[in-house]
Amino acid sequence: MASLAKDPDKRPHSLSEISASCHLPLTFLEQIAFDLRKSQLLSAQRGRNGGYLLTRRPEMISLVEILEVLEGPLKTVPCQDSQCSLSDCATRGFWEVLQRHLHKTLQRITLADLVSKNPRKLLPLVP
């Protein structure tokens, strides 16, 4: 997605092209592209000049959206959504607060921020 976001021409890119430029295995990209298309973060154009495109501007795609498509809901501990097996878990409150802060921070970081030529731009986003 970063490769597509950095393209000034906003033209479709094939997975083979992205694989070569990012040094990632094609089969890995095929799996990721399938999930990103299913979640409507990417679209595909068929044909000779076809390839993949972002469905929204990079400024409108948050890092948390991408991560949750690829990894599932973000959880700091496995028992986050269920009853803890410990009757009196001393750290559950800490993990819940950390989870909220992590989600909020990743929600504010966009794909455009990630590909920005100025990484210092991200520093104000992290409390």
Residue ranges and their predicted role:
Residues 82-127:
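C-terminal regulatory/oligomerization modules of transcriptional regulators
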Residues 32-39:
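Basic amphipathic alpha-helical segments that dock to polyanions
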Residues 58-81, 99-101:
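Conserved segment of winged-helix/HTH DNA-binding domains
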Residues 1-25:
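N-terminal helix-turn-helix DNA-binding core of bacterial DNA-binding proteins
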Residues 28:
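Residues in the helix-turn-helix
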Residues 41-54:
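Beta-hairpin "wing" of winged helix-turn-helix
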Residues 14-17, 47-49, 79-86, 119-120:
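Short linear capping/connector segments at secondary-structure termini
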